[in-house]
Amino acid sequence: MTFFVLFADLAYSQHAAGVESGSGLSDPDSSQSHHSTQAENYFDDKGFRSHRYRAPLPDSVPGGKVVRADEIRAIIDQYNPALIDVLAVTLRPEAIDFGISWLPDSPRLNIPGSVWLPNVGRADLEPYMLRFFSDHLVELTDGKLDNPILFYCIADCWMSWNASKRAAEWGYSNVYWFPEGTDGWEASGGELVETEPESIIEYIQDAEIQ
């Protein structure tokens, strides 16, 4: 099976120049009268954000509960949700022969206790990526659909919205979405720790065999 190389938006790296400067991250059309029409074109027929993943976010997510920076510590302390970081990175399936697959362009600092599942917030996921995502959700929730899950990324990250929506559609009933992500967590005084992405190599290998 031939795999296409998936390239993460440079805007998704906290240290990329585009993020620091804000270059290329604003809505391409500042005209309010055309905003609604253009925004509709950013979604696929299943309602997932399909491109321009770094953009202003809505106030809600289908099937999930929104958590703000001033609430997240209480949510973590009270409900102990599985913390899932979905920040995207470059994926090169052909590199698995060298024991690697994810190629982060800089260290990722996220909320302590988090599991990093890169790219699961994209709209159109390959079958092996869907399995990677769903298997980890089962593991992190002990197979219980009512166990809490909290998704985040960085500020203005539609991938965390997509991941929350997909988990809710799979039947998870306690989905939390933290739209401010690590930016909001750090700004509120939260500690960040360096984390490695979960390996996807076995999923790619299984897909190649099939």
Model feature map: region roles:
Residues D9-A69, I75, A95-L150, I154-Q210:
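Rhodanese-like catalytic fold shared by cysteine-dependent sulfurtransferases
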